[in-house]
């Protein structure tokens, strides 16, 4: 989520944060488990650490290796156990920041592995089923929310235009109508497919 959408929803975000803190105090759980979304959850972690005796567990560790590495100070202070779905993060946190974390596997990797076992790779059938040409494919995965698609798709199409020998295939997200994509696709030659993301990536 970019800066402007956050600004537009600031009142709602603060209201939800206040309610979340009140619920934690009222319920007094054995442990608070935070999931992803560091902009919101690190604030909750700080509150729980400073105002209660409840342990804080964090699932899907903040991607401080990509941006906002300074957040490690808050993580060390406020989070008791950190659980990662990316194997390389263990070395990053442990060696660089001396903060041990746990790699617990990746549900998406497990899902893809199960899909590959159940559906042997068959590129010819995929091309035929979707009326695609027998030429290399650039897969476009612009996101699952309208704001992400609005922000990402035009830039992706611009970058992909530098490869005229490839065909562009856009993986449509569930709940997003084809018409929404078409307003950003414009005159670009793009095939939009739904419910075939793993098949496309094979």
Feature map (PLM): residue ranges:
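Active-site and donor-binding regions of nucleotide-sugar-utilizing enzymes
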Residues: 1-127, 141-152, 163-165, 173-175
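Solvent-exposed alpha-helices and their adjacent loops that cap or buttress functional pockets
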Residues: 74-76, 130-133, 200-202
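Short aromatic/hydrophobic-glycine micro-motifs
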Residues: 98-99, 132, 190
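Structured helix-beta-strand junction loops
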Residues: 27, 78, 133-135, 187-188
